[in-house]
Amino acid sequence: MSAKRVRTAMTDTTEAAADATTAAADADDRGKVVAIIPARGGSKGVPRKNLRRVGGMPLVERAVRSALAVEDIDLVVVSTDDDEIAAVSRAAGARVVRRPAALSGDTASSESAILHALEQLESAGERIGVVAFLQATSPFIPTDALAAAVREVGEGRADSMLAAHETYGFLWGRGGEIDADAAVDADAAVALNHDAAHRPRRQDREPHYLETGAFYVFRAEGFRTAGHRFFGRIRIAEVPEWTAIEIDDEQQLRIARALAALHETPERIPVRAVVTDFDGVHTDDTASVDADGVERVRVSREDGMGVSLLRRAGIPMLILSTEVNPVVRARADKLRVPVLHGIDDKESALRGWAADAGIPLAEIAYLGNDVNDLPALRIVGWPIAVANAHPLVLEAARVVLRRRGGHGAVRELIERVLPG
């Protein structure tokens, strides 16, 4: 390389380093971008709501992961009064601010929790420039829209931004709710965002935007001055309509779980062993009985192929069943899988098998379907449920499979365990 080219390369490198130093200094001057996730332990509509799972993950962990996925967010904080939420949040990578009881009741506002978190952070020496306020009860936070909003506020193009989706809906209200003093029928329907006498086509209308509650981004200084999240130049961060669900009741939780199964790619389950129940997992939980009292069950050949693939990969498997019927052992022998059946205490049996195999419980997946599986599900790192499992099992599961027992659920689990 010529001396001129060397000098040019050195100059370019020096200028790049100077630019990076200047950018870092500017960021220091502006203060950090902090994501704050309020997540109290109490909830009336959905008990322990922030710890309920969607897509196999507690809601508060989903929010933490969404924030961590945004490169421009420097610090992720969970404000909580609850020990379990705090532990889950720390494990997910968040810093925890303990919220006092006075700010943890049903009437406490999100703003009060955010102000308290800012005070705690600043007393610890942090300088905050921009706040991203995320709600754990919104399980689908679009990280691309969140990242764009953080940039827009950080670059000074907006003071406050909210997640919202486009809507062309015709909104109506009741007369008494709109104007209690008006001389109209209190139950009369009143057009809100349109002229009731004119019905334009969708393509001829301008859209409105419905706030989703998933996230808000704003300048910290402006928030302190205003005392609320909307001030100055307010802009919309547009998000897909399907992400707008916010969980306030059990039905919304079920819908969110269904949406997660539709829209999210299943993650690999990195375990060293697979343990399954038999009835309701390898079978559809039904049986036929002949005149001699002999029970027969239906099993899935697809599951059988999955078990053979797991065996070839050298990953241990065990069938652990309460059932004493000889069909359990017959199927296990056919699959060439060890079996413990006629077991009433599944937890103790599983602990003993894991100890003998030298495999930590945290690295075992247990696949179950009914309440007698709960003790085993609670001690493993990966509690898994078939799609049609008992509600208590679905709630205990880290992952809920898409397939039902006896219809490929075992194969589905194995395909998520095997690498590649």
Language-model features: locations:
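Non-catalytic pre-domain segments flanking phosphatase-related domains
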Residues: 21-22, 219-221, 241-276
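Conserved core of the sugar-phosphate nucleotidyltransferase
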Residues: 110-112, 116, 138-239
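Mg2+-dependent phosphoryl-transfer enzymes with acidic/Ser/Thr/Gly-rich catalytic loops
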Residues: 289-300, 306, 325-327, 334-340, ...
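Short phosphate-binding loop-to-helix
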Residues: 77, 83-132, 140, 148, ...
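N-terminal glycine-rich phosphate-binding loop and ensuing alpha1 helix
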Residues: 32-79, 297, 303
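N-terminal nucleotide-binding beta1-loop-alpha1 segment
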Residues: 9-12, 26-47, 276-279
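Intrinsically disordered, low-complexity terminal tails and inter-domain linkers enriched
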Residues: 5-30, 177-189
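Asp-based phosphoryl-transfer active-site loop
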Residues: 269-286, 410
